[in-house]
């Protein structure tokens, strides 16, 4: 029996998809976790699982395992994408003893897992998302609307509003990396930086590149 099994891949939770290598699978005797950054962070106990089955949509790039579960707060469609043979992955999960673990005793750790499950899979506070989306759209519209109100629009509607929006995303991603206080404002209670680490690094890179490009275009 293996103590634990880990694998990097992709994940689909509902209609949201995290491509390789933005998702991690972790399994031991007590828990199965899928960390797909902001797409979702899911944690299961053996009793939460109905079945784990092979999932094949596109050869090689569309193979994975489908996790059928009982958690009402989670989306019913949970797939972990992998380049490995899905049957091999399921076999490795079985070797951890997770699927055969029928221990019914409730521990302190079980209560923490239940609390996290009740929060749903999305790791970021919903009010934070709403505020960010509204502010982002207002900044973009501050460039787009005046641009198309011109008699003869020329060039691209990239101005100071879009630049501030991208800069805001870049600054937020940097603060996620370095500030625990900022993380506590953004993340749900009990969530950690590891839950969004890959997304944060990707956001730093993409928003940083775009901010430099937009700044040059506005000079």
Where are the regions a protein language model picked out?
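Phosphoinositide-dependent membrane-docking surfaces
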Residues: 32-33, 43-58
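Conserved beta-hairpin
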Residues: 7-43
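Acidic, Ser/Thr- and proline-rich intrinsically disordered linker/docking segments
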Residues: 1-14, 51-130
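Eukaryotic intrinsically disordered, low-complexity regulatory linkers and tails enriched in Ser/Thr/Pro
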Residues: 60, 98-219
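Extended aliphatic helical segments
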Residues: 27, 31, 39, 50, ...
């Amino acid at each position: 029996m293996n103590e634990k099994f880990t694998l990097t891949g992709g994940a689909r939770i509902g209609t949201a998809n995290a491509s390789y290598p933005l998702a991690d699978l972790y399994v031991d005797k007590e828990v199965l976790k899928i960390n797909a950054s902001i797409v979702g962070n899911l944690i299961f106990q053996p009793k939460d699982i109905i079945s784990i089955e092979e999932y094949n949509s596109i050869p090689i790039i569309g193979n994975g395992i489908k996790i059928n579960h009982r958690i009402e707060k989670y989306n019913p469609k949970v797939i972990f994408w992998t380049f490995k043979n899905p049957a091999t992955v399921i076999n490795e999960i079985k070797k951890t003893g997770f699927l055969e673990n029928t221990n019914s005793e409730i521990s302190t750790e079980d209560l923490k897992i239940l609390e996290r499950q009740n929060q749903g899979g999305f790791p970021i506070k919903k009010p934070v998302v709403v505020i960010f989306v509204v502010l982002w759209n207002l900044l973009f519209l501050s460039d787009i609307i005046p641009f198309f109100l011109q008699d003869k629009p020329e060039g691209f509607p990239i101005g100071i509003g879009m630049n501030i929006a991208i800069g805001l995303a870049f600054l937020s991603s940097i603060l996620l990396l370095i500030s625990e206080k900022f993380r506590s404002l953004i993340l749900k209670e009990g969530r950690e930086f590891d839950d969004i680490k890959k997304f944060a690094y990707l956001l730093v890179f993409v928003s940083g590149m775009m901010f430099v490009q937009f700044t040059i275009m506005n000079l």
